[in-house]
């Protein structure tokens, strides 16, 4: 068992002991399977990004509703600068994630494998989701931490976003490799 909600099915481990595939049943050349499966990873990672962006936005809706009605020392929490800064920070992180996700999708539509664009989107959106859930919990205080809230569920779910389909550190290593290999071309838009 792993931490976090598994309503979506989760992941599992398969073990093949002594499996032999007759040559007439082999679909590709030996060793080509990983490359073939990686073709679907870009679009799949963007699908994760889209779902995570929705969760991050939901965290902000819940947080805004709460701080809009909750008062502390006679002042609505929404009127406090410290709260506004937290909400504004998350809003801009979500928007950056949206733009990176749309750009990566556009690159895929152009026939590009978009490996660096997908990596950028995956890292940014996973971090934005984790941050959005964390801020929503913080703004709601102990109530936000309760297992009775959607935000608590999203927080546990969101933590896995920085691990599944490649840990954030792996994607950052991929980006560093692209920067080294492409030089100034790394920054080209199209």
Predicted regions and their residues:
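FAD-binding core of flavoproteins
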Residues: 1-65, 75, 168-173, 177-190
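Conserved catalytic-core motifs characterized by acidic clusters
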Residues: 2, 24-41, 66-80, 104, ...
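Active-site lining segments that contact anionic ligands and/or coordinate catalytic metals
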Residues: 9-11, 31, 43, 82, ...
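C-terminal helix-coil-helix/basic helical segment that borders enzyme active sites and/or dimer interfaces
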Residues: 64-78, 91-124, 137-145
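Alpha-helix capping/hinge segments and adjacent helical runs
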Residues: 119-190
